[in-house]
Amino acid sequence: MKQGIHPDYHPVVFMDSATGFKFISGSTKTSKETVKWEDGKEYPLVRVEISSDSHPFYTGKQKFTQADGRVDRFNKKYGLDKK
């Protein structure tokens, strides 16, 4: 690898804006905002809108929408649906 061309990889705290959930991970992302972590060190804080703590897929609150197929739309259009 060439020296001096790669971004700095360092630990960063990511915070879910919706829930306040925080986790630490390695990243090249940086921020002027910092936060003191559980180990007593200060790390850059990056706010994210959605994380595994608030995303419906991971929380189990996912809504499944059933899109009508072509046959269902045809039946509705011509009044052939069974109700």
Swiss-Prot record:
Keywords linked to the UniProt accession: Ribonucleoprotein, Ribosomal protein
Keyword Ribosomal protein: yes
Any single Gene Ontology cellular-component annotation: ribosome
Keyword Ribosomal protein: yes
Organism: Lacticaseibacillus paracasei (strain ATCC 334 / BCRC 17002 / CCUG 31169 / CIP 107868 / KCTC 3260 / NRRL B-441) (Lactobacillus paracasei)
Gene: rpmE2
Protein name per its UniProtKB record: Large ribosomal subunit protein bL31B
Subunit structure, as described in the record: Part of the 50S ribosomal subunit.
Coiled coil: none
